Regions:
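Residues lining hydrophobic/aromatic ligand-binding pockets adjacent to catalytic sites
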Residues: 1-235
């Protein structure tokens, strides 16, 4: 299954090309979910979501919609995965409503660029994560891109986050029964979009779910690209 969207939805500048011109801000997510079937939430990086907030998200989206969420910075940037059992359990517990509704996609653990590879640290942290919750790791230091790290991810069914970066080339390696793409360029040519669709199609052919998120911008290109990708996959 392909889940495609952007890293956010609250952008008035997406009117009228993505949202109808008269769409009020409180209806953005509801309209977004009629065109795309997933979104990546960065809000959770700084704050734990309240039950009221999650209930609103759930009510605004249809069955089959998925919210992928960025793990809280206390886990990834303050503790840097070390001695983070209590924080991780608390964070995952805060997502319980999404889990119960069947709308939790993937939890993204985005590590700081100065954090170098530490296989023992990663192994210990992976041991904290419940198998029922999909996890992906965005490594932003190239020392992490080793077979030892890939093996640890495979053993935990955790995905290597395939994130675009001007400073780093992430190897296109599958380590789980799903893949996770963070596409950060502001624009993609028709040829690039076609190549991307072929890559995603190959993953789907191997029965891997694909979570694909374009960069959020004040203009709607990313959302439109995601919609095009869904149409290609369906077609």
């Amino acid at each position: 299954m392909l889940y495609a969207g952007t890293s956010g939805w609250a952008y008035p500048g997406w009117k009228p090309d993505f949202y109808p011109a008269k769409t009020p801000a409180k209806k953005f997510l509801e309209v977004y979910a009629t065109r795309l079937n997933s979104v990546e939430v960065n809000y959770t990086f700084r704050r734990y979501p309240s039950e009221k907030l999650l209930a609103g998200w759930i009510a605004s989206t249809p069955a089959g919609f998925r919210f992928s969420v960025k793990a809280n910075q206390l886990i990834t940037h303050i503790k840097r995965l070390r001695d983070a059992r209590e924080l991780t359990q608390r964070f995952l517990s805060s997502l319980q409503l999404l889990t119960e509704a069947g709308k939790l996609g993937v939890v993204l653990y985005q590590l700081p660029p100065f954090l170098k590879a530490d296989a023992a640290l990663l192994s210990d942290f992976l041991g904290l994560l419940p198998a029922a919750v999909r996890s992906t790791f965005e490594f932003r230091h190239d020392s992490w891109f080793t077979e030892e790290v890939f093996t640890l991810l495979r053993q935990a069914n955790a995905a290597l986050c395939l994130a675009e970066s001007e400073k780093l080339v992430v190897p296109d390696v599958s380590t789980a029964n799903f893949v996770y793409y963070r596409l950060r360029k502001p624009e993609y040519s028709a040829a690039e979009r076609r190549q991307l669709a072929e890559r995603i199609g190959a993953q789907l052919a191997h029965e891997r779910d694909a979570f694909v998120y374009f960069k959020h911008e004040e203009t709607p290109e990313g959302a439109l690209y995601a919609g095009e990708l869904i149409q290609r996959a369906a077609g």
